[in-house]
Amino acid sequence: MIENYDDEKNQRNGFCLKLWKDGRKVKGYYLNNKINGWASLIRLNFDLKGEFCNDILNGYGEYVDKEENKIYKGFWINGNLGGIGIELGPDYKYYGCFINKIKNGYGKQIWSDNEVYEGSYEDDLFNGYGIYYYKNGEHYIGEWKNNKKCGFGEQNYSNGKKYMGYFNDDKKDGFGIYLYSKDTLGLNFWKKGKRYGLGKYIKGNNIKYSIWEENKIIQNINENEFMQKIIETKKNYLSLFKWNINEINKFMNNN
């Protein structure tokens, strides 16, 4: 049955093609005037095709969002994309879990510039543990909160340097170890991406102890003074600051 429609009327059963003057279209199978079975819909803002039950998408379906230029493919439950699916955006592809058409759970996203995120999502954002590969060759492994590095993580730089420690709001924040080379590293406390407070610098057999502020050394101190300040203010980190370079390298390579 093929008809042109200006309004909704009449009972429909079986295959039907509905055409509206504004360009809307429905093609599929009806039962008691409701779409049941495979159908495709063309609307002003979106296109939709898949398995329907009583006018609602249930089963495999594909949704094209014309306003946001996105395509969703996967399994739908009561009109919502849930479980494993695919989202194709203007400059990225996402493969993973959805709840109500929103990225939730484990997934992998690849951008057109070859940057990649693989890990946990919540409410469409990186949340939890994940790995991000940057186009410049760097990669970050660790915890995320709302698309920003937050918690414990490891930043690997393209020049071979590495930072392992805590982040907040996408910046180094808290205790961290910065590996310059195999025999050179620094143990520092950070604040908003800058070294603050006590720091220990190791280069081979040479060790320096300092106090930092705004990423600059404001005072050099001896080992006894340093350890006493650690005991007074950062006692939980005392054992780490006692490690030698081999122990620190072993720790960083095992994480």
Describe the predicted segments one by one.
Residues 1, 61, 107, 130, ...:
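Proteins with a high burden of low-complexity, intrinsically disordered sequence enriched in S/T/G/P/A and R
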Residues 1-13, 25-36, 47-58, 71-82, ...:
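Conserved anchor residues at repeat-unit boundaries in beta-strand-based tandem repeats, strongest
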Residues 17-21, 40-44, 62-67, 86-90, ...:
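Beta-turn initiation residues at beta-strand->coil junctions
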Residues 27, 44, 234-236:
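Terminal low-complexity, poorly structured segments
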